[in-house]
From Swiss-Prot:
Domain of life: Bacteria
Function, in words: Catalyzes the reversible epimerization of D-ribulose 5-phosphate to D-xylulose 5-phosphate.
PROSITE patterns for the chain: RIBUL_P_3_EPIMER_1, RIBUL_P_3_EPIMER_2
TM helices/strands, residue ranges: none
Residues holding a divalent metal cation: 34, 36, 68, 177
Catalytic activity entry: D-ribulose 5-phosphate = D-xylulose 5-phosphate
Uppermost EC category: isomerase
Name recorded for this polypeptide: Ribulose-phosphate 3-epimerase
Length: 225
């Protein structure tokens, strides 16, 4: 298994002090910044765009930034996020008219590319694009708002995606987003995930390092027989 990565979702941070909160989470031991983009069309919420990402880079954030696009259409905005400093760009297959083309567009703009699957989205979109993926992100809540509870059926879906990744032989991260907490991160990792998005579980606590250390401690107990 790859090294586990913890990716705080800045959707749950204090937007009035976003640079400071993001830097604090990284200093507390996080690996990746998860950046949620919502357009009030594909999902019923409106969040942040490329200018905010560029501001984080200008603030001095050098860690990988994982941009999760919950927008439709997708292709128009991809180059803007790449130019602003995105490291990874993921999108929902339902939001793209041509999934293969969007994946190629992300790569052409110098970013890693990934697909995102909502709780009820079938995995059949993976059938012909595994060779173009760096990340597969499973939503364990319905996208749109932070602070929701983990949907247990995601564990079976994780096992299936882990099997597909292992059989493909490709180097693909398996990421989970939604309701990830200290008390379930071990179970999620055991099902095959190696990258964990956590928003309110980290940012709603006064001590980010304590939460991230507790998550690492749970992950250290996971065995992959």
């Amino acid at each position: 298994m790859k090294q586990y990565l913890i990716a705080p979702s800045i959707l749950s941070a204090d937007f009035a002090r976003l640079g400071e909160d993001t830097a604090k989470a990284l200093a507390a031991g996080a690996d990746v910044v998860h950046f949620d983009v919502m357009d009030n069309h594909y999902v019923p919420n409106l969040t942040i765009g490329p200018m905010v990402l560029k501001s984080l880079r200008n603030y001095g954030i050098t860690a990988p930034i994982d941009v999760h696009l919950m927008v439709k259409p997708v292709d128009r905005i991809v180059p803007d996020f790449a130019a602003a400093g995105a490291s990874i760009i993921t999108f929902h297959p339902e939001a793209s008219e041509h999934v293969d083309r969007t994946l190629q567009l992300i790569k052409e703009n110098g970013c890693k590319a990934g697909l995102v699957f909502n709780p009820a989205t079938p995995l059949s979109y993976l059938d012909y694009v595994m060779d173009k993926l760096d990340v597969i992100l499973l939503m364990s809540v319905n996208p749109g708002f932070g602070g929701q509870s983990f949907i247990p059926q995601t564990l079976d879906k994780l096992r299936e995606v882990r099997r597909r990744i292992d059989e493909s032989g490709f180097d693909i991260r398996l990421e989970v987003d939604g309701g990830v907490k200290v008390n379930n991160i071990g179970e999620i990792a055991a099902a095959g995930a190696d990258m964990f998005v956590a928003g309110s579980a980290i940012f709603d606590q006064p001590d980010y390092k304590k939460v991230i250390d507790e998550m690492r401690s749970e992950l250290a107990k996971v065995s992959h027989e």
